[in-house]
Each structure stands twice: as structure tokens, then as C-alpha cells.
Design a protein with these regions (language model features):
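Hydrophobic alpha-helical targeting segments used for export or membrane insertion
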Residues: 1-11
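Intrinsically disordered, low-complexity Ser/Thr/Pro-rich tracts
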Residues: 2, 18, 35-39
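Processing junctions and N-termini across compartments
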Residues: 11-12, 63
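Mature extracytoplasmic domains of secretory-pathway proteins
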Residues: 21-29
Length: 75
């Protein structure tokens, strides 16, 4: 099994976040749904481990979301 990395996780979550925002969900609900999807795909313990081990998680997450769907991040 391939080790889940922070970049892989954030890219997956970022894509889903944009899709949920495009459906009209707010930021918080979109984020929760996206991480729920990631937990289903990669396993909740793997997702938790990556988040716990990461440094500057918030900065990386916002940067990826702003790149993937700036219309929902930058206002």
C-alpha cells in the first residue's frame, strides 16, 4: 500500500471541497464532507495520522483550495 502524504490528501480534499462548494454548500459543510470522503477512500486512521504529523497544515490546505477554486476562497 502506498503511504498517504499530506499533498495527496490535500489534493483529494481540495477537489472534493470545490465540488461541494459548486453544489452550494458553505465552506464548513464542504470541508467536513470532503474529509469524510477522504476517510472513506484512505481510511480514517491514515487521514488522522497525516493531519497529526503535518506542519503548516492550514497554510497548505488554504493554498491548495485557493488554487483549485479561488472563486470560493478569495473574496
Amino acid at each position: 500500500m502506498i503511504e498517504l502524504t499530506l499533498i495527496t490528501l490535500l489534493n483529494y480534499v481540495g477537489d472534493n471541497f470545490c465540488e461541494y462548494r459548486n453544489l452550494g454548500h458553505d465552506n464548513y459543510k464542504s470541508l467536513l464532507l470532503s474529509y469524510s470522503d477522504a476517510s472513506n477512500k484512505f481510511g480514517p486512521l491514515e487521514v488522522k495520522k497525516v493531519i497529526e504529523k503535518s506542519k503548516n497544515f492550514k497554510v497548505a490546505a488554504v493554498a491548495i483550495a485557493a488554487t483549485k477554486c479561488p472563486q470560493h476562497i478569495v473574496k
